[in-house]
């Protein structure tokens, strides 16, 4: 693929005859330092280091700004970082492309007025209606200081990471597998929102497509055998809440897949949903050319309830493995994949994954426990971080297995890692921390399995919500 790149624009005072010449090395030094900072610290969602493009020349006026823009146009530059230690000619040197994301780093030094250019160019951007981010260091630096201060580095990396995420999602698709689940407002896919705010196309695939592919064998049969063997070896079964229940006939006769064949069916479901999103060259070899293409997805969701789950195994395993940073093929990029096709949750998961590099965990906000309620029910009052009460987030069965926190960082603390840092030991630990319980037939007549695990703490968590009006 052609990766979305960050363009570095070194702007300079254009006065030849001593001024410009004295600034060339420092200005280009800032640009190369920023380029190295980004490329050494940031990754695309597929694990590849983020790529930067350096302007072929410092930019002292409109002619060089145009030359830089022309060069960037052929490099798939989605964002620009303008850097300077000095005064430059505001609107003559700025990035005027309305389609790029912009930031400006003005050097905090006394010898040259980098701050003046930063203020002037930000004013120019505001007057032109072009959003831009201002980056300036807290402390004055010596002109000869080639180090990027920590506070500036953090701002540059935040900007570049978010900009690369925007470039990554552009022109990709959110794939709705099914429609609206149980009247959930978030399941109403707003195609205009996806296009206008995220540059993403919305696509719909009826859930019968999964049945068609299972029936006609439109999946990689060798991979299926590998995947099913992996599932049986690594996905231990937990408790069965249906045991001993006298279930009504309407529930008993609704399960059309034999319980002993649930895992095989679910494994096929998982492979097929992945293939729908991303395509699979193996299908092309099998003669299924259209199916091999996929949907160029960046995220998706599965309706499930109730048109599917009232008679077929649920997709909790599918959703959990899609969102996890590993499967039977080893470590992989996690897929933001929304339970109940809650598209707003799907977008929140996507944004979180793009800027963190880690798997998205889909939880239910189940209860709020006040200190008084804890005291009444358990006889004990919460202490420490929970002393004022806490919100109970529960894994309803479809959360990424990374959410167990079974991975460990260099200090031995529970954590979640970008998939490219996952080890075989991390993967095994997540699998060992999880068991798979039979779905409650009163809710899921078609059966299936739901993940069950306890979180490892302490570790930081970030909660993401998305609302649309």
For the regions a protein language model found, what residue spans apply to each?
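An N-terminal assembly and electron-transfer interface module characteristic of large anaerobic redox
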Residues: 1-469
């Amino acid at each position: 693929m052609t990766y979305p790149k960050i363009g570095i624009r070194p702007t300079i005072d254009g006065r030849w005859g001593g001024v410009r010449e004295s600034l060339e090395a420092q200005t280009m030094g800032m640009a190369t330092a920023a380029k190295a900072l980004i490329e050494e610290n940031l990754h695309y969602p597929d694990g590849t280091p983020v790529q930067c493009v350096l302007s072929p020349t410092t930019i002292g006026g409109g002619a060089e700004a145009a030359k830089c823009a022309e060069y960037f146009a052929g490099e798939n530059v989605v964002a620009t970082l303008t850097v300077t230690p000095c005064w430059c000619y505001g609107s003559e040197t700025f990035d005027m492309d309305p389609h790029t994301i912009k930031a400006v780093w003005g050097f905090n030094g006394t010898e040259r007025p980098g701050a003046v250019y930063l203020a002037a160019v930000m004013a120019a951007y505001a007057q032109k209606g072009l959003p831009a981010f201002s980056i300036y260091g807290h402390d004055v630096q010596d002109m000869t200081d080639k180090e990027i201060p920590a506070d500036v580095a953090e701002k540059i990396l935040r900007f570049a990471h978010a900009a690369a995420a925007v470039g990554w999602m552009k022109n990709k698709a959110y794939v709705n597998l099914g429609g609206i689940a149980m009247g959930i407002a978030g399941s109403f896919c707003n195609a205009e929102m996806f296009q206008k705010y995220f540059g993403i196309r919305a696509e719909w695939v009826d859930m019968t497509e999964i049945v068609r592919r299972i029936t006609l064998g439109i999946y990689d049969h060798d991979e299926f055998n590998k995947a099913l063997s992996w599932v049986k070896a690594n996905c231990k079964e937990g408790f069965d809440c249906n045991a001993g229940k006298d279930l009504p006939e309407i529930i008993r006769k609704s399960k059309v897949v034999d319980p002993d064949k649930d895992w095989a069916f679910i494994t096929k479901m998982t492979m097929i949903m992945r293939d729908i999103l991303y395509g699979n060259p193996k299908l092309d070899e099998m003669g299924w050319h259209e199916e091999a293409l996929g949907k160029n997805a960046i995220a998706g969701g599965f309706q499930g309830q109730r048109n599917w789950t009232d008679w077929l195994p649920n997709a909790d395993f599918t959703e959990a493995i899609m969102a996890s940073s590993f499967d039977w093929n080893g470590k992989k990029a996690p897929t933001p994949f929304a339970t109940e096709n809650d598209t707003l949750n799907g977008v929140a998961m996507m944004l979180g994954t793009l800027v963190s590099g880690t798997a998205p965990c889909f939880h239910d906000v189940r209860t709020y426990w006040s200190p008084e309620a804890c005291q009444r029910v358990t006889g004990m009052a919460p202490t420490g971080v929970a002393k004022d009460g806490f919100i109970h987030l529960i894994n309803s069965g479809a959360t990424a297995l990374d959410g167990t926190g079974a991975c460990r960082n260099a200090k031995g603390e529970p954590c979640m890692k970008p998939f490219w840092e996952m080890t075989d030991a991390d993967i095994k630990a997540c699998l060992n921390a999880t068991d798979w319980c039979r779905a409650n037939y009163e809710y899921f007549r078609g059966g299936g399995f739901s993940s069950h695990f306890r979180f490892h703490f302490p570790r930081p968590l970030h909660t993401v919500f998305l609302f649309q009006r």
